[in-house]
Amino acid sequence: MKKIGIIMLLCMLAIGVQAQEERCPLHYEGSFSMGASSKDLSFMGANIDLGYSPVNRLSIHALAHSDFFIPKLGATKDYNNAVNLGGGIGYQLLNNKNWRLGTLELRGTLTTSLGSSTYKNTSYGVGLYFYKHSNAQRFQPVIGIGFNARNFHGNVPNFYGPYVSLGIRF
């Protein structure tokens, strides 16, 4: 009787297990981004993105990025950087099921900087990101292009310009 109970319990637990073809709704991305020059200022930085897909095409993102701002005159100091935290939302325009090449996702983000810095800012961004889903690979390359608007809170002029992002998704 005990054996039958254990077998029944194990069978009931196995019913809820998903097959290997199912994708985990949680993903991480690490990337480097670089923006075009605007008003004698350009930026580059490192990004960390924690994403969750509650439904098939929609994703919610928590972002952290550290940006280094480069003035045209080249006067770089330690205070030319800012650390931003924020979030975003994404929608898969083309997904791997309908398009064999991979997934094309449209994302909108909003971040704000932490601490006191000359380059304290609020950042608004929209971008297209391409990545390939593969069951054979744990790491997929991510390529993104988009437009970023930064509203600086100090004497620095606001920044508007395109950016390119390259990274790894796992």
Where are each of the predicted segments found?
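Solvent-exposed loop/turn segments connecting transmembrane beta-strands
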Residues: 33-45, 73-79, 112-122, 151-159
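Short glycine/proline- and aromatic-enriched beta-strand/turn motifs that initiate or cap beta-hairpins
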Residues: 19-68
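Membrane-helix boundary connector in multi-pass membrane proteins
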Residues: 131-133, 148-154
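Outer-membrane beta-barrel "beta-signal"
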Residues: 89-93, 157-170
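Cleavable N-terminal export/targeting peptides
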Residues: 1-26
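Gram-negative (and chloroplast) outer-membrane scaffold detector with strong preference
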Residues: 49-141
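Transmembrane beta-barrel architecture of outer-membrane proteins
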Residues: 27-29, 43-45, 82-86, 121-127, ...
